[in-house]
Amino acid sequence: MKKKRTYILLIVALLISFICTACMWTEEGFIEEAEKYMKNKYNDSFGSSFMYDRDAVMMSLNKNQKIYVLVEYGDFKDNGTKEWGDNYLYYLHMDEIYKDTKEVIDTVYENSKIYIHINNITNNFPLDTDIVELYKRGTFTIYVYTDKDIVDKDNDVLKIIQGMYDKSMYCTIRLSYLRESDFTKMSEDKINEVSGNGIYNASTNLYIRSREQDSKWRYGDFKKDLE
């Protein structure tokens, strides 16, 4: 009886090992296919890949490890057919996105700092997709910081919404008015520090979908000084 139990446990262990190995190879194969798709589409190499979701892989651009791209095998046409998609196209247009954003922001603020983050939302757009089509998807978030006084903040917001809407840039803008000393220290790596510790005079989120929207302002409590 004891030997029989030992054999059963051994068989179970072998089965578990086999299943784990099979899953590992399935995952590796999926990642390999995702990297191959990106190589063929963009003629660029990607690596440091890992599973982000069941049907999605996160990977970085080999020549710029700071850029992480999401690649997904999904039903983009809602017809039951799956194909590869990604969000790297937005990174290729980053300079243009920044330029168009700055054109709007500069009409409102004398001093500003702008940081653009591409959201983890994929598409199957071809390489020659017009920038306006990318804008209409709205799958990016723009962080805007200024040291301007908050007295005209509501009018400032109206101008930003109008300017972005005119460019069909249907995105999310996280706008913050900072103290002059904090504005000087502000950098992209301090975004979470500012928002998490209330290091702002006033802050709001703008969702560029229409010209009319109410701004809900938050006022900072300055739990700490910006380092």
Q: What does each of the following model-derived ranges do?
A:
Residues 90-227:
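Extracytoplasmic electrostatic interaction patches
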Residues 45-73:
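Exposed beta-strand-loop-beta-strand "reactive/processing" segments of non-cytosolic proteins
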Residues 64-66, 76-78, 149-151, 182:
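Generic "edge-of-domain/loop-turn" microfeature
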Residues 44-51, 111-117:
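Short secondary-structure junctions
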Residues 67-92:
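A short, surface-exposed beta-strand/turn
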Residues 23-48, 96-106, 157-158:
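Short, non-transmembrane alpha-helical segments in secretory-pathway proteins
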Residues 3-25:
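Sec-dependent N-terminal signal peptides of Gram-positive bacterial secreted proteins and lipoproteins
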